[in-house]
Amino acid sequence: MNEQAEVEQFLNEMTYGCLGTTGEDGWPHVTPVNYVYHQGKIYFHGSRNGQKMKHLKACKQVTFLIAKEYSLIPSYYTDPEMACPATAYFKSVLIKGTAELVEDPVEKAGALQAFMSKLQPEGGYRPITAEDPEYRPRIKGVAVLAIKIMEMSAKFKFGQNLHEEVRESIIISLNSRKRELDEETARLMRKYCPAHKDSGNDSTEA
């Protein structure tokens, strides 16, 4: 799996991110929103008259952050006295782009259907199409926005900079602690370590 595919897999896995906009007062605003990554864009929806829409009318440039914390790593895993080694392992993706109101009903329906497929994969609803007469007024009424991605950077931090013996010691401690996501963190530490990358596995930025 290459780096771009790994980042896109993370975008498809997560269900919400933080939208950064600039308010009319010049202050930055951050709003958590559900999203879907669909056909190379970030889509989200909401009211046509909400605060987000006011901000976007004033400035279409936005940032969008998706992040997931995996495990907190206590300092004593690697140093018996100093607090400095305490850290956290995580994945994050930062997107810069422009947000546009989607007017085309076919594109809107496609984005909304992608939302449902992601957030309600078990089904239990009629598929959303622009041609469906019952969906048509609802599609028209909701504001769907698309972020056209201009720049995307990812950071997956899992101890890639550590010496092998230190990394293995943390992995052993995580597998023994067994908190939620500890075992997954240990697996990702092995996956992303430079030795595994050199042997043919891809990694993301340290």
PLM features: residue spans?
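A general structural signal for short secondary-structure junctions and capping/turn motifs
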Residues: 9, 52-56, 135-142
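Short, structured beta-strand-loop surface elements
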Residues: 49-111
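Short hydrophobic-aromatic micro-motifs
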Residues: 42-45, 64-66, 95, 145-146, ...
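C-terminal edge-of-domain segments
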Residues: 103-206
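A generic structural signal for short beta-strands and their flanking turns/coil linkers
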Residues: 15, 31, 38-40, 58-62, ...
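A structural signal for short, well-ordered beta-strand segments
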Residues: 35, 97-99, 147-149
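Catalytic micro-motifs at enzyme active sites that drive phosphoryl/nucleotidyl and oxygen chemistry
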Residues: 21-25, 52-53, 81-84, 133-134
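An N-terminal domain-cap segment
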Residues: 1-43, 47
